[in-house]
Amino acid sequence: MSNLLRDFEVEAKNPSLEARQRWRSSVSIVKNRTRRFRNIRDLDKLADYENKKHQIQEKIRVAFFVQKAALHFIDAAARPEYKLTDEVKKAGFSIEADELASMVRKNDTKSLAQKGGVEELAKKVSVSLSEGIRSSEVPIREKIFGENRYTEKPARSFLMFVWEALHDITLIILMVCAVVSIGVGVATEGFPRGMYDGTGILLSILLVVMVTAISDYKQSLQFRDLDREKKKIIVQVTRDGSRQEISIHDLVVGDVVHLSIGDQVPADGIFISGYNLEIDESSLSGESEPSHVNKEKPFLLSGTKVQNGSAKMLVTTVGMRTEWGKLMETLVDGGEDETPLQVKLNGVATIIGKIGLSFAVLTFVVLCIRFVLDKATSGSFTNWSSEDALTLLDYFAISVTIIVVAVPEGLPLAVTLSLAFAMKKLMSDRALVRHLAACETMGSSTCICTDKTGTLTTNHMVVNKVWICDKVQERQEGSKESFELELSEEVQSTLLQGIFQNTGSEVVKDKDGNTQILGSPTERAILEFGLLLGGDFNTQRKEHKILKIEPFNSDKKKMSVLIALPGGGARAFCKGASEIVLKMCENVVDSNGESVPLTEERITSISDIIEGFASEALRTLCLVYKDLDEAPSGELPDGGYTMVAVVGIKDPVRPGVREAVQTCQAAGITVRMVTGDNISTAKAIAKECGIYTEGGLAIEGSEFRDLSPHEMRAIIPKIQVMARSLPLDKHTLVSNLRKIGEVVAVTGDGTNDAPALHEADIGLAMGIAGTEVAKENADVIIMDDNFKTIVNVARWGRAVYINIQKFVQFQLTVNVVALIINFVSACITGSAPLTAVQLLWVNMIMDTLGALALATEPPNEGLMKRAPIARTASFITKTMWRNIAGQSVYQLIVLGILNFAGKSLLKLDGPDSTAVLNTVIFNSFVFCQVFNEINSREIEKINVFKGMFNSWVFTWVMTVTVVFQVIIVEFLGAFASTVPLSWQHWLLSILIGSLNMIVAVILKCVPVESRHHHDGYDLLPSGPSSSNSA
């Protein structure tokens, strides 16, 4: 089978165009190409989109480079005139939406200057730059300037899915056969008896189409809901005089937006104020170099990314008036990138389809030959009647229906169904799967490289200890939870200046007047510490003018700010990783509050304090300052600072993380912590989580960086903790792990984590702490930033794989039995025991209902007690082939005995004996599939009933199948070619079906694999990680 599937191999992430085209062209037997490829990306549309995108980028590039220069030579009078409408005037605005859009799109700084700059423009859109808009104004602003939403492709109606299901070529042929059958039947047998056979086929087709359409429609609704979740972005704005968070879709013209590193610019706008703002415009213009935005170059375009710095912007254009909106409009709903399992099952379906087509043709040929020979031997070869035509038509319908059953169209579609179900469940469990393949690949992950802060820990940080003036003070757990620090007025003032000036966060009042701190958890902890010391954020910010800000980034691991002092000169404050900032200091504030030189003895003493804090699992930060005669023109100095304080921030480990790590280890998944924290803090937290164990290695990023490639490969399997790491270190670790055959999942939250997220097999971005850049490069977004959620994604990834294996085992058994029983019977008796209507019903049990029952089963406990699914493992395992062969042989023997000796065994005689026998065969065949569907719940384990009632879908499908079978046999005989059965015959059919359970138990006792695993799972990996988990 592996050799036959050579053309059906694709990479899980970023598959090559050649591989994608190769497997598409290899799919030769398809009943309904429209439906089969509905969820698969259309390569022609993709190429069309890329061309349109390129055209828009070229247009924007012209605006950036040509129009900027041209505008200097254009007379103001030559610019288009925008007449103010009465509606705009009545709403209180004095500028048109199109004029705002044109100014930003053309980078028209001259027009902005003529209007008086951003301050005067704010007045034209009736907004205060300090207070923001009022929430009550949002509806009128949306009416005048538009909503911040992009044109979406209309949702497909249910009737569209019905129409799509009708495109099945075999169903179309059957419909033609049914219509002809009705015509010929009425002519020969009269009305209404002559209509029964054809009408039965038409009703069966209608049922198949409706069930298929309902299943596909529900799937499409799930994907649409998930797509909406992907587009949700939260932005920070100033409204009603306070800073607050809103959805990107609620943004309106006039909003004052706060931007920081990693944010996506949510609309077109104009720079108000900020520091070192660098914008990545490659998504729009294709330019790789970042653009510096300031008061001289003030225009910001929607869809671009903040690469560095921070700023406030005034929103001027939203929705479809922006260039980003126009680009989004060109996006086509071309489906998802195909997953490896979908491609592989397309291959399996193609191979089986070819076999089925051959059997169908042979069956028709054999039936026709037998019919002609019978006519020849009876001497009526020259006399042909309409009844003979009806018989031949019936043979043709049976042959076509064999193709319906034999071409397992449901195999690749079952993967989509299972993934959609898993994605919906994961969404409710706080994980948003952005790419289908990620859920599937997560089932094969052998290693998770996880951040510490917020993922393993709660991210609810508080300053627990502080060293200042040679004293260590601990937080007092009292009614006010305050620190009792005895500081001189000068030291306290300097400390509070450093806390409140050197921050990217804000202290605001909410609508109820309560104090609220907006910003990262670390910033919130330090600001809360400042408030506990009696500081006032707003007073401090008003006292000093900020001259320059160098925002925190994960490379420098520090943040700095420069403020102007009232008496002249300037003061630089810096805070950051203790070891790094300590090296920048020349002085320290001693016990008397005086600044004294930082001797080697004092450095050792402070280092011991830092180490002591870190060993208690506290994150440590140093707060330092430096006075300057004048503001430097370039970057702030990296030396000559005075140490003020070391703070220890407590960030408790999340409840359940240790158990989640143990679950991973039991499942053969190695967990590695990669953090920017001090190595002592990292080791303490890793031990608490169960990650750092005896025999494991904890290493600093700088040490790892200096290793040769050979040395790296030698120690990487032992690494459990990497501390003080840079984003580049994480990328290098991930890259090397993949080279040694690991399937790597990696978490990230910062902009600089994007390369590692992109490099990993599965990129996991944090939904709360993660930047938009990180989320855009991720495959899965962990909405609650919780490590337990990551483990849940792995659990569902494995469930998808094993569920599809169950479905494939079930479907192939039905394929084999249906094909052989009809073919052999046609060869020997000249008739097929299963009619077209019956085969259509079996096809629905097998395809749509079977997929619903088996492909949507929730994960069981045993899934995380096995090793990861090996990428190279054969999808259809020896164990599955054993089960398929054993069940097929049993069913063929029993049904064959009934077919050839049933009348004598069941003592059937009379005119309806053949009809009764064929009904018993049909009934027994269906109940064989019902019980085999239950068997398929477990490929290897004997107890197939465990957890069966936990899956309501499975229970519902079983109930519906049995109820419909009773209706078909007892009440729809005229259409389904059945007759009502006695209770003895019903009991016999159920008994024959239930014996499948005993056959399954016997089969599962037959060993077929020498290894101690099943179902495509590999042995637990050897090495330090597995031994530790043991």
From Swiss-Prot:
The domain of life for this entry's organism is Eukaryota
Record membrane topology: Multi-pass membrane protein
Q: Where in the cell is it found?
A: Vacuole membrane
The record's InterPro entries line, in alphabetical order, gives: ATPase_P-typ_cation-transptr_C, ATPase_P-typ_cation-transptr_N, ATPase_P-typ_cyto_dom_N, ATPase_P-typ_P_site, ATPase_P-typ_TM_dom_sf, ATPase_P-typ_transduc_dom_A_sf, Ca_ATPase_N_dom, HAD-like_sf
Q: Which family does it belong to?
A: Belongs to the cation transport ATPase (P-type) (TC 3.A.3) family. Type IIB subfamily.
Q: Which residues lie on this side of the membrane: Cytoplasmic?
A: 1-157, 218-345, 414-804, 856-875, 933-950, 1005-1030
**Which terms in the GO cellular component ontology are assigned?**
chloroplast; cytosol; plant-type vacuole; plant-type vacuole membrane; vacuolar membrane; vacuole
Tell me a Gene Ontology molecular-function term this record carries. ATP hydrolysis activity
| Ranges facing Lumenal side | 179-196, 366-395, 824-834, 899-910, 973-982
One GO BP? monoatomic anion homeostasis
**Tell me, what's a Pfam family for it?**
Cation_ATPase
Active-site annotation: 451 (4-aspartylphosphate intermediate)
Q: What is the recorded name of this protein?
A: Calcium-transporting ATPase 4, plasma membrane-type
